[in-house]
Regions:
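Glycine-rich ATP phosphate-binding loop
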Residues: 42, 104-139
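Short beta-strand micro-motifs within the conserved protein kinase catalytic domain, predominantly
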Residues: 166-178
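Conserved short submotifs of the Hanks-type protein kinase catalytic core
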Residues: 175-189
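Activation segment of protein kinase catalytic domains, centered on the conserved DFG
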Residues: 195-211
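Catalytic-loop of the protein kinase fold
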Residues: 221-238, 244
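Conserved catalytic-loop aspartate of Hanks-type protein kinases
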Residues: 286
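A conserved short helix/loop substructure at the end of the activation segment
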Residues: 324, 341-353
Length: 417
């Protein structure tokens, strides 16, 4: 009888005993070819050959998309480290969720599910079975550009990180628009989560969640990439609490049909001032976006919710006008946030520094028995925050959003020269 195990750490299997020596299971020989696996249950040669054999049995209808999917499969180093072509008839109960700047999102039941259940008896990966997924339709993707496809190809290793939203593959809907298949995150994005929480979260939850986002951003930057479109709508909440927040839309910036995208696209409050002035996106512009996310967490409100997102706001941002910092914000938190949104990109911290600093805060707050200035500031702020939470628990505190404030990506034509 086969024994099925859920997917856990794919990079290292448990050790096993051979004679009087312990040998990592990842070096255990593949039962098919005798070569060592490179990660949990993954024989590079056998998996690659199996995928190559299937190349003749599927096509997206566009050569460049086929090449993209094949590229991810031939370079996979573990299960789900690649994209699949999944016919649309494999999905049931397709339901519209909402629209963004360049597409719409649907939920659906994927009957087969991803190939991420380990069958210990058969020594192979099996499909998980029915799973709810999100289908992100790319508007006008009948005319999808080769530059957009190459963009996904360049970012695909970032997409497969466990710090990003799980991405399974690509399909095509009955209108011939292509769709990205992702895990369905039942708690929605950061804005939706904050709305359900009346915009007030505990400081420890905020810091812990930001730590995970910083690690994801560090991963993107370590790959030599830039997110370019980091905002609250692209942070997806997996669990009831925020610790499972993932970064989405990595490598999916801008309309899919643009061949040379010269216009600035995105959510204005999160775009760094130097980008608004015409400079290229950079790791530093991602850090600016992170600073605005820090403010979104601390206030519980969408940035610049009370102003039109127009040329006047863009000028204000370039003139170093910044968002209000709540009185109950710990000093150490406010200082880091202000560093992130500094008008000079050279003065902003790196993602690596953010990861290190946020991890240090968690240690000082949760695991260090000795008093510290960080812990004292945190304790005062958390006590204030808990009082606010208790006072607002039964009230609707959602502020009225300006009718010309937009929180989905769009081309900012008013910035064009």
């Amino acid at each position: 009888m086969s024994t099925f195990s859920p997917l856990f750490d794919l990079s290292m299997e448990e050790d096993y005993c051979q004679g009087n020596k312990f040998i990592p299971r990842e070096l255990k020989a593949c039962p098919e070819c005798g070569k060592p696996r490179i990660s949990f249950g993954w024989c590079k040669d056998c998996e690659t050959n199996s995928m190559k054999e299937n190349f003749l049995y599927w096509t997206s209808g566009i050569k460049e998309i086929d090449e993209l999917i094949r590229h991810t499969q031939l370079n996979a180093s573990q299960t789900c480290d690649y994209l699949e072509w999944i016919p649309f008839d494999k999905f049931e109960m397709v339901k519209y969720i909402g629209s963004g700047g360049f597409g719409s999102t649907y939920s659906a039941l994927w009957m087969e599910g991803p190939r991420w259940i380990w069958d210990d008896g058969a020594q192979e990966w099996a499909r998980a079975g029915p799973m709810t997924v999100a289908l992100k339709r790319l508007d006008n993707s009948q005319e999808i550009s080769s530059s957009f496809i190459n963009q996904i190809k360049a970012y695909h290793k970032c997409l497969q990180s466990d710090l990003m939203a799980d991405t399974f593959g690509i399909t095509k809907d009955p209108t011939s628009n292509y769709m990205i298949i992702m895990k369905y995150y039942k708690n929605g994005n950061l804005y939706q989560y904050l709305d359900r929480s009346n915009g007030i979260l505990s400081w420890i939850n905020i810091i812990d969640t930001l730590w995970g986002i910083a690690r994801g951003l560090e991963k993107i930057h370590a790959e030599g990439k830039v997110h370019r479109n980091l905002h609250g709508g692209n942070l997806l909440v997996d669990e009831k609490f925020l610790i499972g927040t993932r970064i989405a839309d990595v490598g999916l910036h801008g309309p899919c049909y643009y061949h040379e995208n010269k216009s600035i696209c995105g959510v204005l409050p999160y775009i760094a001032p130097e980008v608004l002035r015409g400079e290229d996106y950079s790791t530093a512009s991602d850090i600016y976006s992170f600073g605005i996310i820090m403010n979104t967490f601390s206030t519980g409100k969408r940035p610049w919710y009370n102003r039109a997102h127009d040329i006047n706001l863009a000028k204000s941002i370039c003139d170093d006008e910044r968002l209000e910092i709540p009185e109950d914000t710990p000093k150490f938190y406010a200082e880091l946030m202000q560093q992130c949104w500094d008008n000079d990109p050279g003065k902003r911290p790196t993602a690596s520094y953010l990861n290190e600093k946020l991890g240090e805060w968690i240690t000082l707050i949760c695991d260090n028995p000795n008093p510290s200035e960080i812990f004292d500031e945190y304790s005062i702020a958390e006590n204030r925050r808990q009082i606010i939470i208790s006072q607002l628990s039964d009230k609707n505190t959602h502020p009225e959003i300006h009718p010309e404030a937009y929180y989905t990506s769009r081309p900012l034509w008013f910035l064009d020269p």
